[in-house]
């Protein structure tokens, strides 16, 4: 069976990310053109326009630039905080084995750029601007990766996004610890009380949570601002106390029941109940990222670029930047520090055996991504505004950020192109990208058998079901000479229950029931709803409580995703797909054909 896309369709999401990066770049160019046009004086005049709000005798006033940097950017940091919370709770950073390399690389990519910057600016006011070079702009990073378009970027993209999460944590910590004003204890104590109240909001009735979160978040922003801490960190603080979870079976099934009732008797009461039930089956963290994310990407960040990227690039500024250790410190920190820090740390971690890269991800690919990580736009410009008070020096730092971003993009492009030229990729999908691992893979037959047959399959695919008979005959023919390996390739576009079935098989595998569960799901392919899957798990002897916990664990989902990403790396789009002794089998998959292919793969065969 063929599917047009593997796993959850990422096209719309990636298109949105690329469009957001393009819009951010467009507004950056507009800001630079505006600041260098005959109307350049209107740029600063416009962003210094005061905006006030009065309530009785109370009066507050911000400039338009402060409104963007201090208020609207709180939403950006809110989204960053939500994504950090999700990654550490249910995402890539829940498993040490997959997190250690990008985490260590990110730490090196934070520290080495700062050290290099301080070599250029060891003292004086400019030395405090070391935070400008520590962060990577995730939006531009994703957009640059899409423009350069290295082949099969899935694993590299996951690595870089994981790295970016740790990068964001470091940048947020730097802002909180080193770039806040004089601390006012009373206001901060009020902020702590408000934060405790935010933690308790989850216990309120669902209908009251949204408004309560909003009111307390605004109050926290005001308290942090009064307390001397940069108020945008209110967004992070609120995000970190908002709960996140994977969809729970009970809530999903409850939503299905309400929808079924609405289908049988459509009315406004059932419609409201169905909407509420569907909403509550997804964590508020995910709903907020989905709801606010586009406004941040297509509204807040472009406005931030327009307000902060307007650097006057006249001859005097350019010559001053060329002679300025501040500018060179920013460029060297971002371009050299990120490339050497991330790549070097990755090499060291692999060398000493502390961690390993995902299958198909090489150090050369990491180097290209590390170079792109030198695009430190959004938070870099944000910290320029916090760390440097002198307008002339701030402009020189902004020139450094813009120059570093261009050089980092060019460096990443060159590394990807040169490594592909000197080390051309092998034919896609001809060989397995990941060797069989007896400690990880699902095997039948002796571990040390001389012949290996690997199948990428889908439990809802009728052809995979028919192939099980062929596999049984092949195994009977070779006996102990053959080991058979199953790997997942759920084609969700054509088999909507395939991913759930794959997860169920992995949850059963944790109780030693993988092939038992697979056999019964193949027998009843038309009945793979959750109530059926739980019945099958019970029939094969699984502990249902443990099965339910494992089914919704990140470990199980990542295990299926690993196989799916391997398949994407090899450009597999059909099931079943077989590999005979590591080489792709492109002929028929009846038992006779598979037996001939296995016999021909023996050493010394003609």
Residue spans for each PLM region:
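C-terminal cap of thioredoxin/glutaredoxin-like
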Residues: 454-457, 466-473, 534-606
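Membrane-interfacial segments at transmembrane helix termini in multi-pass membrane proteins
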Residues: 243-266, 350-360, 401-440
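Conserved helix-turn-beta segment immediately C-terminal to the redox Cys motif
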Residues: 468-489
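Predominantly late transmembrane helices and immediately cytosolic-facing juxtamembrane segments
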Residues: 2-16, 32-36, 49, 194, ...
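Transmembrane alpha-helix boundary signature
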Residues: 34-46, 59-65, 79-95, 111-131
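C-terminal ends of transmembrane helices
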Residues: 7-11, 78-95, 142-153, 196-207, ...
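Entry/N-cap segments of selected transmembrane alpha helices
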Residues: 87-115, 184-196, 315-340, 363, ...
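Conserved redox-active cysteine motifs that mediate thiol-disulfide chemistry
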Residues: 459-469, 493-496
């Amino acid at each position: 069976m063929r599917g047009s896309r593997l796993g959850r369709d990422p096209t719309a999401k990636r298109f949105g990310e690329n469009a957001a990066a393009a819009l951010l770049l467009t507004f950056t160019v507009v800001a630079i053109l505006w600041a260098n046009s005959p109307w350049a004086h209107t740029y600063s005049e416009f962003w210094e326009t005061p905006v006030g709000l009065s309530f009785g005798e109370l009066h507050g006033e911000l400039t338009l630039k402060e409104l963007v940097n201090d208020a609207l950017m709180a939403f950006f940091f809110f989204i960053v905080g939500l994504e950090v919370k999700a990654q550490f709770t249910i995402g890539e950073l829940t498993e040490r084995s997959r997190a250690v390399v990008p985490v260590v690389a990110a730490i090196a990519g934070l520290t080495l750029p700062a050290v290099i910057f301080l070599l250029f600016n060891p003292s004086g006011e400019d030395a405090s601007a070391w935070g400008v070079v520590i962060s990577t702009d995730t939006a531009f990073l994703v957009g640059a990766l899409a423009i350069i378009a290295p082949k099969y970027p899935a694993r590299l993209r996951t690595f870089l996004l994981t790295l970016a999460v740790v990068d964001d944590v470091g940048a947020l910590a730097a802002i909180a610890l080193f770039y806040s004003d004089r601390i006012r204890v009373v206001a901060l104590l009020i902020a702590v009380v408000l934060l405790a109240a935010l933690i308790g909001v989850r216990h309120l009735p669902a209908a009251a949570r949204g408004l309560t979160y909003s009111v307390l978040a605004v109050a926290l922003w005001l308290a942090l601002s009064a307390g001397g801490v940069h108020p945008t960190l209110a967004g992070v603080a609120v995000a970190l106390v908002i709960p996140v979870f994977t969809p729970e079976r009970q809530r999903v099934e409850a939503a299905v029941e309400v929808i079924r009732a609405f289908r049988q008797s459509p009315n406004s009461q059932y419609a409201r109940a169905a909407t509420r039930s569907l909403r509550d089956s997804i964590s508020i963290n995910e709903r907020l990222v989905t709801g606010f994310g586009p406004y941040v990407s297509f509204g807040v960040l472009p406005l931030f670029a327009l307000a902060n990227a307007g650097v006057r690039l006249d001859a005097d500024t350019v010559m001053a930047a060329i002679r300025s250790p501040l500018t060179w410190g920013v460029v060297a920190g971002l371009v050299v520090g990120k490339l050497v820090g991330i790549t070097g740390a990755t090499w060291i971690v692999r060398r000493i055996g502390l961690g390993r890269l995902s299958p198909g991800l090489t150090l050369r690919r990491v180097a290209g991504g590390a170079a792109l990580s030198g695009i430190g736009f959004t938070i870099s410009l944000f910290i320029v505004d916090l760390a440097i008070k002198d307008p002339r020096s701030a402009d020189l730092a902004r020139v450094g950020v813009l120059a570093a971003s261009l050089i980092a993009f060019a460096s990443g492009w060159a590394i990807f192109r040169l490594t592909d030229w000197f080390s051309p990729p092998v034919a896609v999908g001809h060989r397995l990208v990941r060797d069989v691992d007896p400690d990880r893979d699902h095997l039948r037959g002796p571990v040390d058998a001389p012949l290996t047959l690997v199948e990428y399959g889908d439990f809802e695919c009728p052809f995979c079901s028919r192939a099980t008979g062929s596999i049984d005959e092949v195994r009977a023919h070779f006996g102990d000479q053959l080991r058979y390996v199953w790997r997942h390739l759920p084609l969700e576009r054509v088999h909507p229950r395939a991913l759930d079935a794959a997860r169920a098989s992995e949850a059963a595998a944790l109780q030693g029931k993988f092939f038992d569960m697979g056999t019964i799901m193949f027998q009843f392919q038309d009945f793979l709803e959750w109530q059926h899957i739980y019945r099958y798990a019970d029939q094969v002897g699984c502990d249902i409580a443990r099965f339910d916990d494992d089914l919704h664990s990140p470990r199980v989902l990542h295990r299926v995703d690993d196989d799916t990403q391997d398949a994407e790396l090899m450009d597999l789009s059909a099931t079943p797909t077989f590999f005979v002794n590591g080489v792709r089998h492109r002929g028929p998959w009846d038992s006779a054909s598979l037996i001939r292919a296995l016999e021909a793969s023996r050493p010394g065969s003609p």
